[in-house]
């Protein structure tokens, strides 16, 4: 578990910031592992992008215009429940992509996705990705394998939310974020973590203290 969570103030949603068209191989694991022929189908359409904290990547029930491939940072996939509350159902980092519903042939997001740890990456217009998928069976299968892996993550998150103690859920969440970030600090508030786990802030504070005591 990481020590010394750095506290930051809550921010309102912002927009990703475009840099330039990307042509070299990115750090994103999905893109960097593509065959040369499949990568060429995407390369000319990829745009480098800065992803500041709270940047909105997908909004529930709205058409997906862009699919994002993170090189750094972490995105939260959240479900909105009663009275505007949110609970995290999945994480995406440099291992993956957003827009899984696009890969499966749909147009609208089923959840909301935004950046929780700022970073950078690349994006492609959803229509351009659809064109590339139609042009390559191997590309379709490759991205569908990620969709399956992401669905397993979502299933395990649901199981943890329903059965695990808060300390276990928090430890799991911290490790998942750890796998997708660099350094020894997370610029996240206890309140934000509580929102992601769907628990009270006081519960997160107590659980963090318990985990810290176990690490000595």
Where in the sequence are the language-model features?
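Cyclic nucleotide-binding regulatory module and flanking cytosolic helices
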Residues: 4-52, 97, 102-103
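A residue-level structural signature of the nucleotidyltransferase/glycosyltransferase Rossmann-like core
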Residues: 31, 67, 89, 121-122, ...
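Cyclic nucleotide-binding regulatory domains
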Residues: 55-118
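Hydrophobic (often cysteine-bearing) scaffold residues that line and stabilize catalytic clefts
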Residues: 66, 143, 166
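Cyclic-nucleotide recognition modules
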Residues: 90-148, 152, 156
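Short, Lys/Arg-enriched, Trp-marked, Pro/Gly-tolerant hinge/linker segments that flank
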Residues: 154-166
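Short amphipathic alpha-helical elements of helix-turn-helix/winged-helix folds
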Residues: 169, 173-177
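Phosphate-/nucleic-acid-contacting segments
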Residues: 176-216
């Amino acid at each position: 578990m990481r020590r010394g969570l750095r506290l930051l103030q809550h921010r309102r949603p912002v927009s990703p910031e475009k840099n330039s068209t990307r042509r070299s191989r990115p750090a994103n694991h999905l893109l960097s592992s593509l065959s040369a022929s499949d990568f060429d189908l995407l390369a000319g359409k990829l745009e480098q992008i800065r992803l500041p904290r709270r940047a909105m990547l997908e909004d529930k029930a709205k058409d997906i215009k862009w699919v994002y491939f993170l090189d750094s940072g972490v995105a939260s996939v959240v479900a909105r429940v009663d009275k505007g509350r949110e609970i995290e159902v999945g994480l995406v980092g440099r291992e993956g992509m957003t827009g899984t519903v696009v890969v499966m042939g749909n147009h609208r997001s089923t959840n909301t996705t935004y950046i929780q740890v700022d970073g950078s990456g690349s994006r492609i217009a959803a229509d351009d990705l659809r064109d590339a998928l139609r042009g390559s069976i191997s590309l379709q299968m490759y991205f569908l394998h990620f969709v399956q892996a992401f669905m397993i993550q979502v299933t395990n998150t649901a199981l943890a939310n329903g059965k695990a103690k808060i300390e276990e859920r928090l430890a799991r969440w911290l490790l998942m974020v750890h796998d997708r970030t660099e350094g020894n600090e997370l610029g996240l508030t206890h309140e934000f973590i509580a929102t992601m786990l769907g628990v009270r802030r006081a519960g997160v504070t107590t659980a963090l203290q318990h985990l810290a005591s176990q690490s000595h």
